């Protein structure tokens, strides 16, 4: 049986992971809003288009980096989760899959 301190530590970790997921999704939404605004170029010339493409490429790289970081954080802590935790019948693998699904759904919108 787990000690109260261990349970608190595990709950704290889960809340941190969920907060990180929410922050990442919010960050991705901000990038998407920025991308949508930047695509509308009036009177385009080659220099303006190249600058906007560069900005879009940079935003896309940030988005990919945020997703990779989130996956890394979740997978690094998978052993800790599988040793200690089951949330309403969910295994650690299922929790991580849910996090990845959230990212995929967000990516589609």
Curated annotation (Swiss-Prot):
The chain crosses the membrane at residues 5-27. The record marks 23 as: Seems to be involved in pH gating. Residues 1-4 are virion surface. Phosphorylated by host. It is a single-pass type III membrane protein. This is Matrix protein 2. Keywords: Coiled coil, Host cell membrane, Host membrane, Hydrogen ion transport, Ion channel, Ion transport, Membrane, Phosphoprotein, Signal-anchor, Transmembrane, Transmembrane helix, Transport, Viral ion channel, Virion. Homotetramer. It comes from the Viruses. Coiled coil: none annotated. Forms presumably a highly low-pH gated proton-selective channel. Trp-23 may function as a minimalistic gate that opens and closes the pore. When the environmental pH is lower than a threshold, the BM2 channel would be activated and selectively transport protons across the membrane from the extracellular side to the cytoplasmic side. Crucial for the uncoating process. GO terms for cellular component: host cell plasma membrane; membrane; virion membrane. It is found in: Virion membrane; Host cell membrane. Influenza B virus genome RNA segment 7 encodes the M1 (AC P06816) and BM2 proteins. Normal translation produces the M1 protein. The M1 termination codon overlaps the BM2 initiation codon in an overlapping stop-start pentanucleotide 5'-UAAUG-3'. Termination of M1 translation triggers reinitiation on the BM2 AUG in the +2 open reading frame.
């Amino acid at each position: 049986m787990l000690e109260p301190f261990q349970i608190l530590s595990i709950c704290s970790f889960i809340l941190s992971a969920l907060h990180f997921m929410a922050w990442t999704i919010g960050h991705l939404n901000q990038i998407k809003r920025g991308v949508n605004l930047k695509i509308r170029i009036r009177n385009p010339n080659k220099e303006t288009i190249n600058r906007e493409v560069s900005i879009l490429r940079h935003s896309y790289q940030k988005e990919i980096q945020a997703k990779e970081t989130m996956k890394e954080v979740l997978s690094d802590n998978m052993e800790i989760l599988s040793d200690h935790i089951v949330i309403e019948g969910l295994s650690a693998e299922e929790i991580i899959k849910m996090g990845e699904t959230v990212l995929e759904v967000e990516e589609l919108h």
